[in-house]
Amino acid sequence: MSQDWSQFKNFSIEEFRCQHSGDDGMDLNFVAKVQKLRTAFGAGLTISSGYRSPEHPIEAKKATGPGSHASGRACDIRIYGQDALDLLHLALDSGDFTGIGVQQAGDRSRRFIHLDDLDNQSRPTIWSY
């Protein structure tokens, strides 16, 4: 089923496709929240991981089964330093995200902030990798 991505000024379907299968399984309501965050941030955001099919190697090896990326309601944004701190504050203040993961150690090219909007019992939550 084809989805209409024309509502997103700063993002395209290609940025969010599964890097393993090429599938598009993003929830457009979630992408709208990321677009709202991007607009508030006022600068480009690089999506390092969006949708992951259940067969994606990262999802397939999870003991509890596929996670938030497989639901189409999560993404990782490659960002570090002051920009990461600014984005983190905006994401927290927005109230749109119930899961926020922060990876800011090591090589800058591998640093990111994870965002999701799952609505299970253990939310809201924030964690570090």
Give, region by region, the residue ranges found by the protein language model.
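Generic alpha-helical scaffold signal
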Residues: 24-31, 50, 71, 81
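Solvent-exposed, flexible loop/coil residues
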Residues: 9-12, 55, 60, 64, ...
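Extended, low-complexity, intrinsically disordered C-terminal regulatory tails
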Residues: 32-62
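Catalytic cores and adjacent binding grooves of peptidoglycan-active enzymes
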Residues: 65-66, 70-75, 79-129
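Generic structural signal for short, solvent-exposed loop/turn connectors between secondary structure elements
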Residues: 19-27, 42-44, 62, 79-84
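Extracytoplasmic cell-surface/polysaccharide-interacting catalytic and binding patches
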Residues: 1-40, 108, 114, 118-129
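A short linear-motif detector with a strong N-terminal bias
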Residues: 25-27, 54-58, 79-80, 91-94
